[in-house]
């Protein structure tokens, strides 16, 4: 089974990915692929830089380039359970769908809760104020072409998990969905 996770910043994708890793899933993140490329180019890992770099890579190499790089790794892991985090463009989804058994899960969490999580997380490159957070939301959702299109990705999801509550509640919803696929 290959599970892809998409959702807005601090929605809880990483928590669900960690839960699946603890259940034996092999983990890949498209954001890590971006961070690796930023390091190669000696760029700061700020959110703005990563968004810009992702757009540049999609223009230069194709809209699914980050997923193409992950698919190369997935192809070596036939039959393994895999989770792919940080899917932010429909082209990436199309590439990942080339894998048998790919399922896309959208993770939804209200903006205020996501901002509170982001502040608590304290990751380098994250925004500092709620207004900055909302401005970044616009950047992540208003693009056409090679830019991030999170709303479109969420619309393409096979199911959506609401992550407004506790991590345990979201994990339970994920397990329920996975069990429904096996029956």
Predicted regions and their residues:
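P-loop (Walker A) phosphate-binding loop of NTP-binding proteins
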Residues: 8, 20
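Short, well-ordered beta-strand core segments
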Residues: 27, 104, 159-162
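Walker A/P-loop
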Residues: 14
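Small-molecule kinase domains that catalyze NTP-dependent phosphoryl transfer to phosphate-bearing small molecules
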Residues: 64, 120-173, 177-180
């Amino acid at each position: 089974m290959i599970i892809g996770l998409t959702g807005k910043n601090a929605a809880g994708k990483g928590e669900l990915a960690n839960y699946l890793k603890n259940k034996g899933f092999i983990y890949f993140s498209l954001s890590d692929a971006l961070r690796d490329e930023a390091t190669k180019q000696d760029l700061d890992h700020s959110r703005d830089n990563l968004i810009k770099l992702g757009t540049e890579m999609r223009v230069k190499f194709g809209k699914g380039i980050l997923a193409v790089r992950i698919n190369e790794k997935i192809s070596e892991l036939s039959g393994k359970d895999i989770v792919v985090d940080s899917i932010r463009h429909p082209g990436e989804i199309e590439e990942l769908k080339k894998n048998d058994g790919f399922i896309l899960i959208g993770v939804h969490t209200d903006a205020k809760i996501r901002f509170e999580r982001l502040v608590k997380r304290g990751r380098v490159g994250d925004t500092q104020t709620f207004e900055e957070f909302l401005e970044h939301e616009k950047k992540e959702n208003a693009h056409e072409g090679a830019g991030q299109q999170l709303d479109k990705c969420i619309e393409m999801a096979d199911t959506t998990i609401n992550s407004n509550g506790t991590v345990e509640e979201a994990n339970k919803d994920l397990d329920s969905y996975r069990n429904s696929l096996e029956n």
